[in-house]
A protein has these predicted regions:
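Class I S-adenosyl-L-methionine-dependent methyltransferase catalytic core
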Residues: 1-181
Length: 181
């Protein structure tokens, strides 16, 4: 979809830690952790030359940086983690995980709930308040009704991607940049 097209203009997606085998983000990522249909285990798969990535992992418990191509040093990695977390009760845990993964460049699509504790914990470098409501796709690729809440795309930890993020997302809604460090 268009959100992923914009994300890929900022940087290539290296990892989708909470993907699904039918999700477009999981197909675009070099590697993803996805929930198997018969269990609650998550399986890492790679679509590139790294076909030996077949581990049972939990996206909330597995360190993300080692799964990206090459080493990550001082948050200068161009390849990023794209996170579209479950929007239910698990969202708080995913927000804490994203905040903790400080060695990864992360772009996340989340509900724009700026008044919540989990949002404050995210503390994005920048975020775009998307104009309108996002329409998600079902497993067949059919567009569903618009989300009943506003959405935001957040950039976390990756100050080196800030100018590109602003350039790409400013046409989709206002972009807010953190002024404290």
């Amino acid at each position: 979809g268009w959100v992923l097209d914009l994300v890929e203009k900022v940087a290539p997606i290296g990892l989708d830690p909470c993907g699904h085998e039918l999700a477009e983000s999981s197909r675009r990522a070099r590697a993803c952790l996805f929930q198997g249909s018969s269990s609650h285990e998550l399986i890492l798969v790679a679509e590139s030359e790294n076909k030996d990535y077949h581990f049972h992992n939990d996206g909330l418990k597995t360190a993300w940086a080692p799964l990206l191509r090459g080493a990550v040093h001082n948050r200068q990695k161009a390849e990023l983690v794209f996170v579209n977390p479950p929007y239910g009760r698990e969202l708080k845990a995913w927000a804490a995980k994203m905040a903790a993964e400080r060695d990864c460049a992360i772009i996340a699509l989340v509900p724009a709930r700026v008044d919540t504790a989990w949002w404050r914990e995210l503390d994005p470098v920048a975020w775009c308040a998307l104009a309108g409501r996002v329409k998600f796709l079902d497993s067949e690729g059919t567009e569903q009704d618009a989300a009943p809440f506003p959405s935001a795309v957040c950039l976390l930890h990756a100050t080196q991607l800030l100018s590109k993020f602003v350039e790409v997302f400013q046409e989709r809604g206002p972009v807010y940049v953190r002024v404290h460090e």
